């Protein structure tokens, strides 16, 4: 899975996503950021600024960001001769994050349920989540939370 998120500056969404286990979110304000993140960090989420700098030509910038984020194989390194060290560093970062993170269900159960209900209450999110989630435990947790 790959998540595209954002907020006014993109910084808040970046910080929020990076608190979750298994998520490596990068900050992307231009296509080069998307390309380098895909090649060097090989993460699974991007945070975009939806207000800051979103003027003329923003739709073109957004299109080019998506092209660079999803075009071709990820994790090839940039420049290519740095691939091995960059991949090794990405694994080290992932292992460090895993060592200090709670499992997702433990994390969700530690968060204020009203905050979660607000965050998960959107109709479009729910449609996407319930139609695509493969984690039965997570689906049941979210259903029960929203039914409270």
Predicted regions located by residue number:
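C-terminal binding/interaction regions
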Residues: 35-148
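Short Gly/Thr/Asp-enriched flexible loops that form oxyanion-binding sites at enzyme active sites
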Residues: 12-25, 29-33
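Short, structured active-site "lid" loops
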Residues: 1-5, 9
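Short Gly/Pro-enriched loop/turn and capping motifs at secondary-structure junctions
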Residues: 10-12, 53-54
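Short hydrophobic alpha-helical runs that function as membrane-insertion/retention elements
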Residues: 5, 24-28, 45-47
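Residues at structural and domain junctions
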Residues: 2-3, 23, 52
């Amino acid at each position: 899975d790959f998540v595209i998120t954002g907020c006014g500056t993109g910084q808040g969404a970046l910080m929020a996503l990076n608190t979750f286990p298994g998520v490596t979110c990068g900050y992307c304000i231009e296509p080069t950021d998307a390309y380098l993140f895909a090649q060097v960090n090989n993460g699974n989420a991007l945070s975009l600024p939806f207000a800051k700098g979103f003027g003329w030509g923003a739709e073109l910038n957004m299109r080019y960001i998506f092209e660079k984020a999803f075009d071709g194989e990820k994790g090839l390194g940039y420049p290519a001769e740095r691939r091995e060290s960059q991949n090794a560093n990405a694994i080290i970062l992932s292992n460090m994050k895993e060592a200090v993170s709670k499992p997702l269900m433990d994390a969700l159960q530690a968060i204020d349920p009203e905050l979660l209900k607000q965050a998960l209450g959107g109709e479009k999110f729910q449609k996407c989540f319930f139609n695509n989630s493969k984690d039965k435990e997570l689906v049941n947790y979210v259903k029960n939370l929203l039914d409270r």
